[in-house]
Amino acid sequence: MDNLIKQLQMSVSSENVDRNFIEKCIEMNPCRRMLHEVLLERKDILRSRMNLVALYDTDEQSSEIEEILAQFENPTFPLEEVNTEKDEEWQPLERKYLDGINRIKEDTIMKQIQLDKDMEKALTNSEEVLRNHRDFRPIDEKDFSNIRQSISKRFEHSKNNIRGEAATKILVLRREIEQQGRKRRNFDKNTTDILQNWFHDHRQNPYPSDQEKAELAKQCNIKISQVNNWFGNQRIRTKQQALRMQEDERERAASMANEAQAIQNSLNSSTVASSSNMSTSGLINIPLVNPTMQSMVIPAVQPGLLGNPNAFLHQPHYFTAGGQMSLNDNGNGQQFFTDYETFGLAQSDTESFNQMGYLG
């Protein structure tokens, strides 16, 4: 066994050794079969410890990176154009951006092509190594599959790194273009004041003529195209501000109406609740008709009363006779005072009644 191990070490470490001679010696060695069985057992142990899920699992590409790399096929200028007329100052920036995108794209494609070539070379070499090892140790098809999968995964990870680097370069390029464009678009305070004063003085019709544009450009030491862009942007900003103010006013009016309705509903609920509580507690549970006063209803006038004075004496009393009602109670629980002996209009005798002069 020791002799066999030494021969294996010689075949691995030495480059000038006669390979055919070593292979023949190993094949004829009586311990070769025993070594083969030991290697198979060792191989099974190693396979049981391998994480085959991680080996065959592939890295998912980031959706954000793919969205950024879409600039390769459909590049979009970072600076938004608010006017149909393109600013002359932006044209060099746009060319710079497109050239930068093309350079990043070409560099990424070249790196991916080189990775593909290296992966094919690595796969070929690894398969050749396994075929050579087959003469000394047990090799099956699963070994070829595992090594191909391992190499492919490593190179796929490298490709994802290259795409991530390309996305980072695109973001840096866009940020540079945005900063340069912002510097070109921002005027100094004096230029801004001149343009804003003209816009404010002509706010009813903020559209300068060609002559006025040329004069403003001369005063501000800028180009006419920049004057056009500034007024276009200013008109849009003013319109958007007016729309926002109208929307805020509508929301404020709606909020005030809702608050007023809520207050009114609260007052109505309070009134109904108070009335319900008063009715329940008996505070307004007062009878409309006093039973004691029901006997005081004036009866209908009898026929012949007006034609015969004496007939009036025979009419029933309008009110209850004296002594039948307490002088300190009018039937409703209230105290009263009277100069008459009784509470009735009709007197107890005819002479007293005539003295009152009711009939003239």
Swiss-Prot record:
InterPro entries from the UniProt entry: HD, Homeobox_CS, Homeodomain-like_sf, KN_HD, PBX_PBC_dom, TALE_homeobox
PROSITE patterns linked to this entry: HOMEOBOX_1, HOMEOBOX_2, PBC
Region (PBC-B), start-end ranges: 85-179
DNA-binding positions: 180-242
SUPFAM superfamilies assigned to the protein according to its UniProt record, in alphabetical order: Homeodomain-like
Chief location bin: nucleus
One annotated Gene Ontology cellular component of this protein: chromatin
One example GO MF annotation: RNA polymerase II cis-regulatory region sequence-specific DNA binding
Chain spans, region PBC-A: 1-82
Subunit description: Forms a heterodimer with homeobox unc-62. Interacts with pqm-1.
Family that this chain belongs to: Belongs to the TALE/PBX homeobox family.
Protein name: Homeobox protein ceh-60
